[in-house]
Amino acid sequence: MDHQDKAATVAMASRPQATQLQEPVTFRDVAVDFTQEEWGQLDPTQRTLYRDVMLETFGHLLSVGPDLPKPAVISQLEQGAELWVADRGGTGACHPGWILEPEDHTLLKDQGLPKMEPSPITEKDGFAKAVPCRSMIGIDQESDGQRQALKKDQSNLNDPKEIPLQSQSHKSLGLVEACVLGLNTYLLPDISGREYGCTYDSQVKNSEHNPSLVRQRTDSPATQSFDDNGSQKAFDQIMPITELTKSQVQDKPYKCTDCGKSFNHNAHLTVHKRIHTGERPYMCKECGKAFSQNSSLVQHERIHTGDKPYKCDECGKSFCHSTHLTVHRRIHTGEKPYECQDCGRAFNQNSSLGRHKRTHTGEKPYTCSVCGKSFSRTTCLFLHLRTHTEERPYECNHCGKGFRHSSSLAQHQRKHAGEKPYECRQRLIFEQAPALIKYEWTEPLGCDSPLSQGERTQRSDRPFKCNQCGKCFTQSSHLIRHQLTHSREEEPLRGRSRRQEQPCRRGSRLIQNTNSNSRELPVAQPKAGQASRTLALFDLREIMQEQNPVHVIGVEEPSVGNSMLFDTRESR
């Protein structure tokens, strides 16, 4: 009988067993037990690895069956307590995938197999930590030839070899012949990229096995190889689990019925569905804020505890979230990966780019529910809502006065501190910027001392100059308002025609009609409740329209570099 016939015989013999393995998997089937002596031989790193794997295994079982009760060992591991499992009859199991019954021990004793001895976790060839274990073989008691082959193979058990985790079990044999701290790859197709290996050494002929000895899913016989004697070849190399489970990772059988997104695990799908349902089962005990994931709650609790584990190496600033540190580092590196396609401006955050795009589109998605006014940012909407609610959250510590904005509070506190940060060209100091602007509108720019080079540069930025006092302005409209102050100071001249032209820089000028019948404009009197300094272009238009000889055709708002022209015509 050649190798292909033998492989076919093995496949046919294992088919009934494959049907039998469709039983519900319990935590006992995948748990790993250590005696007190064995637990004491593990170092802290190995115990931490054991804890992580056991908790992750139980989590995957919960994703399959949510009603699975929580074992006591899981509760102890979650609390971080030290534990050890009592010896179960003197035979320690190095793999949780199978449990030996009393009749199994008798069978092993009759077959002359050595007892299972756990070995410490080791590293080999740079791969992840693996758990060596002795292979347990199911024997056909009716075959004497296979008994002799078994005795021959027992001599090889003293020198175990490393095999890939994919060959966990073999249907042609009777028992699982690999172990990874209780890790079953058919239950855990993805374990966060960690790689495990296990020891294996067995060269035994095909035999029918005792079904009571196996409680583990088996691999396909097509993936197994046989030597000339029909026995399975020993594997002498370790392969990463990431390679072996690549097809399993790409397979996403769990699909969301709402949006069609697929996932590898049912637990991931359960968390994703909370986005559609709005369910937030994890609530903060401090502030009552709820979250859909436990990890989000843990990150939020750092706000209350003040824990900031992520520290910047450049400036030493700490953050409670790793994403905040990543964004902060772009300040030092100058990285701006988010670029606007309309103007080419770059930003270091995607949210900043989103806000910037609204300046091009004019979108204002945030609308006030009271008055209907829209805003492009949520912060602007929140500040606007305070005008309706009369909320003043910023209160002065000295006088108790409240303000809607923090900037208004800071401006108010300068009165108590006597701080005057605004300084004019004549070295006069003001508490607030509006007071400085008012002074510049009414007072000339002249200085007793010679101007410095910096002041000359600043003056050159004010091209509009008043001919009466020499004061300069940045905008022509400011010059017009300033000239009204001079007109109120002078006594109006009536019955006298004159031609007046006030040249300004950059071609700005005021042209009045030179007709002999034209008369001087009267003094503009401010209206009730209106400050004299607030007279603007529309006030000037009203004054000119009241006079019969002069009719205003139009007043154009000036801009820097353009002429300002008042077209006047004599009324007939």
Curated annotation (Swiss-Prot):
Record Pfam families: KRAB, zf-C2H2
Comp. bias intervals (Basic and acidic residues): 150-162, 486-504
GO CC term (a single one): nucleus
InterPro entries reported in the protein's UniProt record: KRAB, KRAB_dom_sf, Zinc_finger, Znf_C2H2_sf, Znf_C2H2_type
The UniProt record lists the keyword Coiled coil: no
GO molecular function: zinc ion binding
PANTHER family assigned to the protein according to its UniProt record, in alphabetical order: PR DOMAIN ZINC FINGER PROTEIN, ZINC FINGER PROTEIN 154-LIKE
Name the UniProt record assigns to this protein: Zinc finger protein 8
Protein species of origin: Mus musculus
Classification of source organism: Eukaryota, Metazoa, Chordata, Craniata, Vertebrata
Gene encoding the protein: Znf8
